[in-house]
A protein has these predicted regions:
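Bacterial N-terminal signal peptides that target proteins for export
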Residues: 2-14
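Prokaryotic Sec-type signal peptides and long signal-anchor helices
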Residues: 13-16, 82
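Extracellular and organelle-lumenal recognition/adhesion modules and their flexible linkers in secreted
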Residues: 29-320, 327-339, 350-355
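Active-site loop/turn elements of alpha/beta-hydrolase fold enzymes
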Residues: 341-343
Length: 355
């Protein structure tokens, strides 16, 4: 079978003309394009469901602990410095190494952020043996050696860059203490100025025995101070342990116990969110087992709540837990949207770790 061969010159002429035309047009200067956008704000064009307007609240950059949550004591249970399970500490780089090889900033195991000695005659040690309960993994051992010249000794809680107090306002203190001396030693607890030179409240005195006991007191501030501290001191040589040291302003949002800062909560409320999504995104993903919130571990007394080193490289108390979030949503008239971990950690932080 023979194929017929032919050339269609009309088609060739058409193609050549198109190519030449395109070349010529590309050589022409571009003409300015003038566009006009008209916005008609009067009247409803497309209805928008008002329930689509809401907020996401996440524990990041101390947005909760040290922010919205009204707790004034940083590292109240002395858990900062306890590495998560299967995450060894690299002392040379001050990082944790996760099971999948990702690193996250950390600190030395003997560090006690948020706390310091009041004078050199005091030694402080994180203790992993004397514990209030099985939920807490460390307490603070305080050893004071005093003399007529050295004066009192003890520890200072600095809060989050200072503890802001106002004259006449009340602050609720609670803490666990346990003594080690044959004869109970008196320890004094007070609010003082940042240098611990001037007392700014009444003084609370206790003499802890051999058993753990929770003590409670309500201070009344005698002066305004933006950066006060909480001091726990002894005038004689003494050895004692502390744990779950908490200080709350009595005036929380809506007067809730274990509640929110009224100024920040009022700002959130002023946005009138129809829903609140909590407790975050990457915070919920975590980076290994035990480094993301599980709702049932954020309930109950603050001494029973699980603490962990979060994905943003600081300690999380879970003091603002599932109940407190629901309470906040109720107080603000917002629908709660709780974010749960699916069992897979953040994909952006090396290969996934499945729990």
């Amino acid at each position: 079978m023979r194929w017929r061969k032919y050339i269609d010159f009309d088609v060739i002429h058409l193609l050549v003309g198109a190519i030449v035309g395109m070349g010529l047009s590309s050589c022409q200067p571009e003409m300015p394009v003038i566009s006009t956008i008209t916005v008609e704000a009067d009247g409803l064009t497309v209805p928008v469901n008002p329930d689509l307007y809401g907020l996401t609240i996440e524990e990041i950059n101390h947005g909760i602990d040290g922010g919205l949550y009204a707790e004034l004591i940083q590292n109240r249970s002395f858990e900062d410095g306890v590495p998560p399970l299967n995450c060894p500490y690299d002392a040379a780089r001050n990082v944790l190494i996760t099971p999948n090889g990702w690193t996250i900033p950390f600190m030395r195991g003997d560090s006690v952020p948020g706390w310091r000695r009041i004078v050199p005659n005091t030694q402080i040690y994180p203790d992993m043996k004397e514990l209030v309960n099985d939920k807490n993994r460390r307490s603070l051992l305080v050893a004071v050696s005093t003399s007529g010249e050295s004066g009192r000794g003890g520890v200072i809680a600095e809060g989050y860059r200072g503890i802001p107090i106002r004259k006449g306002e009340r602050y609720d203190l609670s803490f666990f203490a346990k003594g080690a001396n044959m004869v109970p030693r008196t320890i004094r607890v007070a609010l003082e100025d940042s240098m611990a030179n001037t007392v700014l409240s009444d003084v609370f005195q206790v003499a802890p025995l051999y058993e753990w006991k929770r003590y409670r007191h309500t201070f009344t501030a005698t002066e305004d101070a933006p950066n006060a501290v909480l001091t726990i001191t002894a005038d004689t040589s003494a050895v004692f342990w502390l744990d779950v040291v908490s200080l709350f302003p009595e005036g929380t949002w809506k007067g809730r116990k274990n509640g929110l800062r009224p100024d920040l909560a009022a700002l959130v409320d002023s946005l009138a969110p129809r829903f609140i999504r909590f407790p975050g995104g990457s915070f919920v993903e975590g980076y290994t087992a035990g480094t993301y919130p599980i709702w049932r571990e954020t309930l109950g007394d603050i001494s029973e709540r699980k603490h962990f080193w979060n994905v943003w490289a600081y300690g999380t108390t879970n003091g603002m837990g599932y109940h407190e979030y629901l309470q906040m949503c109720e107080d603000m008239g917002a629908e709660p949207i709780y974010v749960i971990n699916s069992g897979i950690t953040s994909q952006s932080r090396r290969p996934r770790y499945e729990d």
